[in-house]
Amino acid sequence: MGNCLDSSARVGNRESTFGGSSRISRKPNQSSRLSSLTIPSYSNNSFTTSSWSNLTPRSEGELLPSPTLKAFTFNELKTATRNFKPNSMIGEGGFGCVYKGWIGERSLSPSKPGSGMVVAVKKLKSEGFQGHKEWLTEVHYLGRLHHMNLVKLIGYCLEGEKRLLVYEYMPKGSLENHLFRRGAEPIPWKTRMKVAFSAARGLSFLHEAKVIYRDFKASNILLDVDFNAKLSDFGLAKAGPTGDRTHVTTQVIGTQGYAAPEYIATGRLTSKSDVYSFGVVLLELLSGRPTLDKSKVGVERNLVDWAIPYLVDRRKVFRIMDTKLGGQYPHKGACAAANIALRCLNTEPKLRPDMADVLSTLQQLETSSKKMGSTQNIVMSPSSHMS
């Protein structure tokens, strides 16, 4: 797993769950109804749940009838991480630290460094920002929802005040680091479309399972060795509306710059809130800019506000494209991706597409990117696209 940083802060402060962005938190009006959240209880060192919705996820994923998680002891995880040594740490944040460790592939018992399976061990501070409820929520969802584009939760440890989670290790780290870290190798167009498609596939699966992710952002998108994206950090996930309800009203918690404007204003949460966040990340993939950039001035500090005028005119799309691409991308594909982002960022939630529709369009884009030969790579120059 890549950088694994988390905290909760008010608007204006920088924060990150697996990287760096600002967390927003606001309680709903007292008259608002809070949706119920089923969280796991404990029995004989394993997890049980009192109820779970009847879900019909896609065939690509799997809904387990009960979690299949390993209950680690604290001493086992101390051994696996070499006593949580500083040189084993791969991430740090307000929640605590993440360490690289090794366990047996079948036994899941601690093994020597370099042998067995590499894992990421997330160790929470007792006074950290990620509370017990968020910790349980993550176990609840990742313990039951299995999909190629969700980070796999292998197990947990709960001993007294000690709370740890054990995940599969993601060798390429977070998308945020690849896009924004100084000195990072530029991501080619084909890889960016692969990341967008695989992240959309994970989010689409969640929505089909009636789960609202609520924290879709570049730092929560982790990458495997082949740059397949997997969604991580499910502490803010929420069960979607059921029956004739159109939304869930809840405390406003999310990340500044990624959270949908109507959710921030009203606390009304729908799957279209996630769609907006996806549009922001897609815009980050296209532009190579973070959603909030304090190094910029004026409208350029907010990626969405700056980019929207260029997204609506295909002749100006090149103006928002990441210069690190060196112009090596298909103009038609860039315009198509920009159009997807524009639709996702619609201020009217009902006019945003479903993630299933986004996924279908991105699949076509990713397929065309795979087939793209060098003759289709064009260098975009301002003179050739002036209106």
Swiss-Prot record:
Residues 84-365 form the Protein kinase domain. It comes from the Eukaryota. GO terms for molecular function: ATP binding; protein serine kinase activity; protein serine/threonine kinase activity. It is a lipid-anchor. Coiled coil: none annotated. A lipid is attached at G2 (N-myristoyl glycine). The modification Phosphothreonine is found at T73, T250, T255. Residues 1-37, 368-387 are annotated as: Disordered. GO terms for biological process: defense response. The modification Phosphoserine is found at S219. The keyword Membrane applies. Pfam families: PK_Tyr_Ser-Thr. Gene3D superfamilies: Phosphorylase Kinase, domain 1, Transferase(Phosphotransferase) domain 1. The modification Phosphotyrosine is found at Y167, Y263. It catalyses: L-seryl-[protein] + ATP = O-phospho-L-seryl-[protein] + ADP + H(+); L-threonyl-[protein] + ATP = O-phospho-L-threonyl-[protein] + ADP + H(+). ATP binds at I90, G91, E92, G93, G94, F95, G96, C97, V98, K122. It is found in: Cell membrane. Its EC number is 2.7.11.1. Belongs to the protein kinase superfamily. Ser/Thr protein kinase family. May be involved in plant defense signaling. This is Probable serine/threonine-protein kinase PBL18.
